[in-house]
Amino acid sequence: MGKCSGRCTLVAFCCLQLVAALQRQIFDFLGYQWAPILANFLHIMAVILGIFGTVQYRSRYLILYAAWLVLWVGWNAFIICFYLEVGQLSQDRDFIMTFNTSLHRSWWMENGPGCLVTPVLNSRLALEDHHVISVTGCLLDYPYIEALSSALQIFLALFGFVFACYVSKVFLEEEDSFDFIGGFDSYGYQAPQKTSHLQLQPLYTSG
């Protein structure tokens, strides 16, 4: 029962991670955020690997999944620092999230709750084929939305890491005990015996 509860809990957290990652991937696609798109794709693959390892009792897959979660926590911590401009990080310095391929920002910048977008006509700040907009009235600015989204990812990743370590430890202990007691012999397994189709004939000797 304990093993099942641990596995079921890990699968549930993996499913939550998958839903949160897909939701985030959609909004990053809408905002042309290529660096987060790549990271989200790798994260989705790792979560699927974690689900497969949990269902199929593969401890190695869970170890890889747990190792990825460490990197995932670090990435999301960087995103929080980036959008909140912690230290030397600044959103106006460069466009890290788009690999410097476009001037797009987060999709939430223009589509946040309560945001009112007003085009600025004849602005000298506008580059070629671009326009300047003014965003006002937002109930929550987009840097805080992105930071909250990353904080949610960190929360799920920490719980997933703990349960992945626990379940993989259970799997490894079961594998060790299985090898120690002789594999299939403990379950009454017997190898099939070869049957002979030769018929024995009586041997007569003359006295």
Curated annotation (Swiss-Prot):
In terms of one coarse class, where is the protein primarily found? membrane
Identify one Pfam family in the record.
NKAIN
Write the record's keywords in alphabetical order, separated by commas: Cell membrane, Glycoprotein, Membrane, Transmembrane, Transmembrane helix
Compartments (UniProt record): Cell membrane
Task: Give the membrane topology.
Answer: Multi-pass membrane protein
Q: Which residues are glycosylated?
A: N100
> Is NADP one of the keywords?
no
- Tree of life domain: Eukaryota
**Any keyword Electron transport?**
no
InterPro entries to which the protein is assigned, alphabetical: Na/K-Atpase_Interacting
Kindly provide the name given to this protein in its UniProt entry: Sodium/potassium-transporting ATPase subunit beta-1-interacting protein 1
Which gene is transcribed and translated to give this protein? Nkain1
